[in-house]
Amino acid sequence: MALLPDKEKLLRNFLRCANWEEKYLYIIELGQRLPELRAEDGSPQNSIQGCQSQVWIVMRQNAQGIIELQGDSDAAIVKGLIAVVFILYDQMTPQDIVNFDVRPWFEKMALTQHLTPSRSQGLEAMIRAIRAKAAALS
């Protein structure tokens, strides 16, 4: 996650964008910074249902109990949204993820108001899947 900003910097950078075209480009840029997903991680068990695009999210717990997330999508904007979600959940334990509500951050960014309904539903599906996987680990 070293290539991605922390939560506060994400919000600052997002709010500095002059318009929604710049914000979308920033989201896409964040997606390009995600490390490449290993071929074996692009399996059906890591696929997120409820997304219009293909989405894979892998969750691993490190020795310190911190969750490490990896993901990919076949759509650039969706891959960027994955990066945004990963930034919000960065350095958290499974219980932290279960307890943390990302929606206020999306509201601060005015993110959901500018996504198509299918993208918003896909974003919710990603969050539900991450929280469910975290709950199983906590």
From Swiss-Prot:
Keyword Lyase: no
Catalytic residues of the enzyme: C51
Biological process terms in GO annotation: iron-sulfur cluster assembly; sulfur compound metabolic process
GO cellular component: a single term: cytoplasm
Localization: Cytoplasm
Pathway(s) where this gene product acts: Cofactor biosynthesis; iron-sulfur cluster biosynthesis
Gene that encodes it: sufE
Gene3D superfamilies: 3.90.1010.10
Function (record text): Participates in cysteine desulfuration mediated by SufS. Cysteine desulfuration mobilizes sulfur from L-cysteine to yield L-alanine and constitutes an essential step in sulfur metabolism for biosynthesis of a variety of sulfur-containing biomolecules. Functions as a sulfur acceptor for SufS, by mediating the direct transfer of the sulfur atom from the S-sulfanylcysteine of SufS, an intermediate product of cysteine desulfuration process.
The keyword Repeat is annotated on this UniProt entry: no
Protein name: Cysteine desulfuration protein SufE
Keywords attached to this entry: Cytoplasm
Recorded superkingdom: Bacteria
SUPFAM superfamilies in alphabetical order: SufE/NifU (SSF82649)
Family the UniProt entry places it in: Belongs to the SufE family.
Pfam families for this protein: SufE
Quaternary structure note: Homodimer. Interacts with SufS.
Upper classification of the organism: Bacteria, Pseudomonadati, Pseudomonadota, Gammaproteobacteria, Enterobacterales
NCBIfam families documented for this protein: PRK09296.1 (NF006792)
